[in-house]
Amino acid sequence: MNVNGRVFDQAHAVVSVFDHGFLYGEGVYETLRTFNGQPFLFDRHMQRLRNSSRMLMLDVPLSDADLLRRCRQTMDAAGLGHGPADEAYIRILLTRGVGELSYDPGACPTPSVVVIVKAQVDPSVDAYERGVTLALVDVVRNHPGSVNPLIKSNNLLNNALAMQQAARRGAYEGVMRNFRGEIAECTTSNLFVVKDGVALTPPLESGLLPGITRAFLFEVGAEAGIPVREAVLRDNDLLKADEAFITSTTRGVVPATKVDDQAIGSGVPGPVTRALGAAYNQKAQELTRETEKRKA
């Protein structure tokens, strides 16, 4: 763990109870993982971190290079991220910092920066081979006029409530709709459906976090010759899809083969899902090996 530049073990890493990230959820974060010991798509994650912080009028006190150094320092201390045998999960948290009990941003003179590193744990083989179950939950995704979903905020109550409902129904992920009833995203991932060989995902206008893996899959699909497009989706588009899958940084492409009690398509991971998943994994390996060579 790294708290404001100092490395601690988990038992001794602390932040103040007066940190506004703790008091008010006032902060942003990014989650990354390594492939071949390299933080994957680091630059894109940092761009999103800065976009999120800008919307909160929160300064990022470090350069991307400094943040990368802190990640590597923390990975080294944890004995992780040296190669394929010990890949790392990385979370970077930026908060308003320590201040008085006040919503006034001026109450916090210095932002807090925390880096958490632990071993990367991939989903089970069964999740990739048989697929996971989704649940259409009643919790509505944040309205952009309140807490904009474009902000990857430390305040995750909206997602947590949706995940609680999904978990009670035995689902792996909850599918959230926006205030218009359109599908937005899942609780911790972006959603794609496949129809007639085309992978479709809701546009940002449907009120979702711009996932790094989601965006990268457009590039992966183009290289693999698989159409990947944005489209407004509703419940029936998911229920009547040929295939479906979810994407996230730590999981890549995970097939979804069931919604509540209904099978999606044939009820097994489909060819488009498998092809995109394989192409994504191959591209991740290629890019991180190139980074490793340049570093050497």
Cite the ranges covered by each PLM segment.
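Secondary-structure junction motif
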Residues: 213-214
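Conserved alpha/beta cores of soluble small-molecule-handling proteins
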Residues: 1-175, 179-182, 209, 218-296
